[in-house]
Amino acid sequence: MVSIRLSRGGSKKRPFYHLTVTDSRSARDGAFIERLGFFNPIARGQEERLRVDNERLEYWKGQGAQMSDRVAKLIKDAAAA
């Protein structure tokens, strides 16, 4: 099954996440099919907190990709804002 989830980047104590389309069997930070955007939980001031390619997100959802709980919440919150 294909899933849309976060993969961690950044350094120790300074997390940064990429929204990736990946096979659900691969490791969290392992191989991925496509990168759809990023999430920066420690963004300050004018820094961008979330960026998502909505066109590609809708494409992958149409192909049957399942979003993780956290990604679904981020997308929902971004749409409301």
Swiss-Prot record:
GO cellular component, one term: small ribosomal subunit
GO molecular function, one term: structural constituent of ribosome
Alphabetic keyword roster: Ribonucleoprotein, Ribosomal protein
One Pfam family matching this protein: Ribosomal_S16
Coiled-coil annotated residue ranges, if any: none
Gene Ontology biological process terms in this record: translation
PANTHER family per record: 30S RIBOSOMAL PROTEIN S16 (PTHR12919), SMALL RIBOSOMAL SUBUNIT PROTEIN BS16M (PTHR12919:SF20)
Family: Belongs to the bacterial ribosomal protein bS16 family.
Name the UniProt record assigns to this protein: Small ribosomal subunit protein bS16
Organism: Teredinibacter turnerae (strain ATCC 39867 / T7901)
